[in-house]
Amino acid sequence: MELTPRLAAVAALVPACHCMADIGTDHAYVPMDLVRKHRVEHAVASDIHKGPLDIARRHIGENRLSRWIETRLGGGLETLQPGECEGVVIAGMG
C-alpha cells in the first residue's frame, strides 16, 4: 500500500513516538504506514461513523497490524485518554 501524496505529506509530519492517534481515520492508511515504517509503536484509529471504522478494521486486519493499531468508535479526541498518545492526526475531515 502506497500513500497518496497528500497522505504521505501528512504522515511525514508525525514525529517518531510511542503512540499516535488518527482522528477521523476513514481507512487507517496513515497509522498503518507509520506502524509499518516503525515510526510509531502503537496507533489509535478512530472515527465517529461505524462504516468507515469497519473499513479501517478490515484494512488493519488484512495487513496483520491489529496487534499495533487499535480502532475506536467516537468523535474527536474523546476516544483518547489524557496523555495516551504523543501525536495526533486530524486530516481530511469535512
Model-inferred region functions:
Residues 18, 41, 86-87:
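Conserved acidic residues
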Residues 27-40:
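Conserved SAM-binding loop of SAM-dependent methyltransferases across substrates and taxa
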Residues 77, 85-94:
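A short SAM/SAH-binding and catalytic strip from SAM-dependent methyltransferases
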Residues 17-26:
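Conserved class I S-adenosyl-L-methionine
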Residues 42-47:
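Conserved SAM-binding motif I beta-strand of class I
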Residues 1-18, 32-33, 54-83:
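S-adenosyl-L-methionine
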